[in-house]
Every structure is written in structure tokens, then in C-alpha cells.
């Protein structure tokens, strides 16, 4: 359920914000337009948000700045510490992951996440979306930004291009984690009563907005 990558993110906690700002050349294209992407997700979110994989709290900060109530879920203790330092008392930050998490004390209208859903296998993504469908009423939404691919060939070409540039850390990451395709995601959302749209943000990342159609 993504926790197999926990050690990696506990090591990354200190330098994560530098990575998203483009200091790591291998990941510069992945995080291109990072601030704009987070703003897009924050603008699409409703008023009461359950956020998964908050990391150091960058999306959380934007949600709070827009006057939204946020319940943040993060499995990494060092990441939670960084987020708490950044956000102070403004957000509720809880230990959990995409599949196992404490329920918010009030109804939510949005589930949000950035750069994290790929930690789940496709089967786990299906399980997660099924859970979220039970939490949301009609009109509630899931707003995720994450790396995904048009099809398997696009994925293959991206990995090959990374290796050709000597970006072996990036290529290894793409092959190690569970990056999926748009058609798989569309099917998963549809199977659980969501209408979904995708908007490409850079060469890697798409914003997906899935709106609950049935109760």
C-alpha cells in the first residue's frame, strides 16, 4: 500500500523541497510548473479536504491559504515533522496512508493528493478509490496530480529517454514504482461511480478530477 517506499521518503524529507524547486536535474521535468500544479489542485478542491501523502505540506499550505479545512494523512514521521514546522497549528496532520487512515471528524467533499498515488499498485488504486467512493456524496470529488502515461508505449519511451540522458535515478524510479496509464485510471474511477477528466500539466504529470455521480 505504498509503505514499501517509506524509507526512501524518510531519507528525502530534508531535501524534498529543494527537489521540487528544480535543484535535482533528473527530476526537473517531473516538477516543472510545480507551484502552478499545486494551485490548480487547490483551486479545484472543495471546502473540506482529506489530503493523502501531504509530504512537507506544500499542497496543504495552498489549501489552507484558500480558507479550506484540511485533514492531512502522511505515513512518514520525518515528513509529518517538516509539514508541522511549515504549517504550525493550522492543519490536522495524521499518520496513515491511502488505504489505512483515520476518518475525519466531519463529512468531506474532496479527496486530494499530489505526486503520491503512484505508490499504489493498480489493484491498490482500485481498493483506494472504492473506499473514497464510500466517503463522498454525489458531487464530491477526487483531485489528484500525479505522473501517469497515455499508454504503455509512452511509458516505455519515457524510460528510454531518461536513460539516454543519463538520468538513471529517474528511470529506476519509473520502473520501481507503480506508474499507470490514463485508460486504467479512467476505468478504475468509472467502476466506482466517478466521472473523470484529465489535464496534462507537464511531460509527466496530469491533474485528474473525478466527480462522484452516484451515492
Curated annotation (Swiss-Prot):
Pfam families referenced in this protein's UniProt entry, alphabetically: Methyltransf_11 (PF08241)
Ligand binding (S-adenosyl-L-methionine): 53, 74, 97
Enzyme Commission number: 2.1.1.-
A biological process from GO: methylation
GO molecular function: S-adenosylmethionine-dependent methyltransferase activity
Top EC category: transferase
Keywords: Methyltransferase, S-adenosyl-L-methionine, Transferase
InterPro entries: Methyltransf_11, SAM-dependent_MTases_sf, Uncharacterised_MeTfrase_YrrT
PANTHER family: TRANS-ACONITATE 2-METHYLTRANSFERASE (PTHR43861:SF1), TRANS-ACONITATE 2-METHYLTRANSFERASE-RELATED (PTHR43861)
Family designation: Belongs to the methyltransferase superfamily. YrrT family.
Function: Could be a S-adenosyl-L-methionine-dependent methyltransferase.
Protein name from the UniProt record: Uncharacterized methyltransferase GTNG_2476
Organism: Geobacillus thermodenitrificans (strain NG80-2)
Amino acid at each position: 500500500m505504498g509503505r514499501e517506499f517509506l524509507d526512501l521518503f524518510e531519507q528525502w524529507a530534508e531535501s524534498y523541497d529543494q527537489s521540487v524547486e528544480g535543484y535535482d536535474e533528473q527530476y526537473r521535468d517531473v516538477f516543472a510548473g510545480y507551484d502552478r500544479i499545486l494551485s490548480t489542485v487547490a483551486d479545484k478542491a472543495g471546502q473540506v479536504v482529506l489530503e493523502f501523502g501531504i509530504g512537507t505540506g506544500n499542497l496543504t499550505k495552498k489549501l489552507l491559504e484558500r480558507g479550506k479545512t484540511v485533514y492531512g494523512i502522511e505515513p512518514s514521521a520525518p515528513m509529518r515533522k517538516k509539514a508541522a514546522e511549515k504549517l504550525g497549528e493550522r492543519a490536522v496532520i495524521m499518520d496513515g496512508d491511502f488505504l489505512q487512515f483515520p476518518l475525519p471528524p466531519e463529512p468531506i467533499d474532496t479527496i486530494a493528493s499530489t505526486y503520491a498515488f503512484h505508490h499504489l499498485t493498480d489493484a491498490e488504486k482500485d481498493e483506494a478509490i472504492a473506499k473514497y467512493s464510500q466517503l463522498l456524496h454525489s458531487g464530491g470529488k477526487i483531485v489528484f496530480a500525479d505522473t501517469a502515461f497515455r499508454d504503455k508505449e509512452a511509458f516505455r519511451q519515457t524510460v528510454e529517454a531518461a536513460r539516454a540522458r543519463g538520468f538513471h535515478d529517474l528511470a529506476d524510479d519509473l520502473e520501481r514504482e507503480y506508474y499507470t496509464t490514463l485508460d486504467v485510471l479512467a476505468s478504475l474511477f468509472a467502476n466506482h461511480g466517478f466521472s473523470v477528466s484529465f489535464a496534462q500539466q507537464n511531460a509527466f504529470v496530469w491533474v485528474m478530477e473525478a466527480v462522484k455521480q452516484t451515492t
